Regions:
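Family-specific signature for flavin-dependent thymidylate synthase
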Residues: 1-355
Length: 355
């Protein structure tokens, strides 16, 4: 077994290729195939997902396009008015007779409007798909990352219980590590089950207790049978739990013991009861480590942080507070550190935007 701590990192992209790479990462996270990512691998991977109907992954690829209303194709106008898009209008001095629109959306909206257009964008050899957009009367623009409609993605490692809460915020796009297809008994790939430390197991206490646990493990003869060895480890954790009077230490030892038992039950279900991984997962508890990719507009991120960090509508769980604080801290860094690209309120526009 392995123990990890919650961690959240914000990803974002200012060009199409970067967004396609984010979508690939989100898709591969689900089945833990990130090791297969290589230059250009997103093309084959995303087209495969489209063929299988898994188009939700395309939501993690942000799309930022702009142009005059009277030059936009009907597809671009429909994309602009999608419930999953946001837009801002402007009046340009060069053409005061036509509104100029900045559209903030994602590749799934494009796919739902025109599947062939989305596939062409995935396969484009340019950074932003300039010629493809130009044919539809729009051009790519680079948003300011502090704009309310810029899209931000969080790569979150946390407890399964926190993931279960976050997926209820459906205004966000999410991709979650699968427990159905991840075989945690396959030692060549996963080594073992990973657990994410809850808020009530303090780092310093856990480190000291786990160090003592490992010291006692080294003192016993290693059992070659995987499950019997896990039972030996559980005996050690139980003895440490029973013989310690400090409540913080007892919590740590009890937590270690529970994680060992969870791994025992999972492996017994697999190895002795002949259950496939998708059925043995029923033995996994809500403390297992789970990864998710979580994408949304800045404005929606602020709303979720208000609810899940600042308890706007009721107190959120402390484990949720940890994850949301990490997201907020990194969002603040990205929003304030991006260098001004232009003096525009929206960012940098392609030279062809007003053609």
């Amino acid at each position: 077994m392995k123990f990890v701590r919650p961690v959240s990192v914000i990803h974002t992209a200012h060009n199409l290729k970067g967004g396609l790479q984010l979508a690939e990462f989100a898709g591969r996270l689900c089945y833990k195939s990130e090791g297969k990512i290589e230059p250009g691998s997103y093309v084959k991977f995303l087209l495969m997902l489209i063929d299988k109907g898994h188009t939700s992954i395309l939501e993690h690829c942000p799309i930022y396009i702009c142009g005059y209303h009277d030059m936009m194709s009907i597809e671009m106008i429909n994309i602009r008015h999608s419930a999953f898009s946001r837009f801002v209008s402007d009046i340009k001095y060069a053409r005061p007779d036509s509104h100029f629109y900045y559209i903030y959306t994602n590749l799934r909206v494009v796919y739902n409007e025109n599947p062939e257009l989305a596939k062409a964008l995935i396969q484009t050899s340019t950074m932003e798909g300039d010629e493809i957009w130009k044919a539809h009367g729009v051009a790519w623009f680079v948003p300011k990352f502090d704009h309310p409609f810029a899209r931000m993605s969080a790569y979150i490692t946390t407890l399964r219980s926190v993931v279960d809460e976050l997926v209820r915020e459906r205004v966000q796009s999410d991709a979650v590590e699968s427990t159905r297809w991840c075989d945690y008994s396959n030692e060549g790939r996963f080594d073992s089950i990973s657990f994410c430390l809850p808020h009530w197991v303090k780092d310093s206490t856990f480190n000291a207790c786990f160090k003592r646990f490992l010291k006692d493990v080294e003192a016993i003869e290693k059992n070659e049978d995987k499950i019997q060895r896990l039972y030996d480890l559980e005996d050690i954790a139980f003895c440490l739990y029973q013989n310690d009077i400090n409540i913080a230490n007892k919590r740590a030892y009890h937590y270690i013991r529970c994680c060992i038992m969870d791994e025992i039950f999972y492996n017994e279900a697999k190895d002795e009861l002949d259950l496939p991984a998708q059925d043995a997962r029923e033995y996994l508890f809500l403390g297992i480590k789970s990864e998710m990719y979580y994408t949304g507009f800045n404005k929606e991120w602020d709303n979720i942080i208000d609810k899940r960090l600042y308890d706007k509508y009721g107190k959120a769980h402390p484990n949720m507070h940890i994850t949301m604080q990490q997201c907020k801290d990194h969002l603040d860094v990205i929003r304030t550190s991006q260098k001004a690209i232009t003096d525009s309120d929206h960012g940098g526009e392609s030279e062809s935007a007003g053609d």
